[in-house]
């Protein structure tokens, strides 16, 4: 049976006492550590801080004769949602994880989720109407918020590509769906 313990800040927890309680239990075997440090993290330094924390934790556990076999590093790596955003420095992170793995002789588990699948979807839509507003044009498409709800729910940005060259678009435009709902929009 798997048990989990959340340690937000080791200085606030009597870490050694907890470890000894676990170690002396007939029902608990400590063999893995798992972390979750956030989502859409764009830099490597938070992950490096986490690896340093794990190095210290594994060293403390080793002193108590507890061998960690697995470390689940979770996910958290960001993905770019448009061409302006920079990509996550994966090679640098991978190098740091490799060194951590070698130092601690553990198997690494990742939960990359969005990092692997976040950019694989595409919606192909056609313009069904152009509405002239006072300050901008609205391009009404045959796709709606029910096809891509992330913008309505999270104000998420997605790259919009047109078959026309961008320099041919002279005025501010907003791409929207045909549902009469203020959040049925995809972006400008």
Predicted regions and their residues:
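Charged (often Lys/Glu-rich) extended helix/loop segments that serve as interaction or gating elements
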Residues: 96, 105-188
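Conserved strand-turn element in the central/C-terminal portion of the radical SAM core barrel
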Residues: 29-42
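Alpha-helix-loop-beta-strand connector modules within alpha/beta enzyme cores
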Residues: 54, 93-103
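Glycine-rich beta-strand-to-loop/alpha-helix junction loops that act as flexible
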Residues: 37-38, 71-81, 112-114
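Short glycine/threonine-rich loop-to-helix capping motif typified by GTGT followed
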Residues: 43-49, 80-92, 118-129, 188
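Active-site mouth loops of central-metabolism enzymes
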Residues: 8-13, 40, 44-46
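Short, small-residue-biased leader/transition segments that mark boundaries at the very start
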Residues: 2-7
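Structured alpha-helical segments in the cores of large, soluble enzyme domains
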Residues: 11-29, 54-66
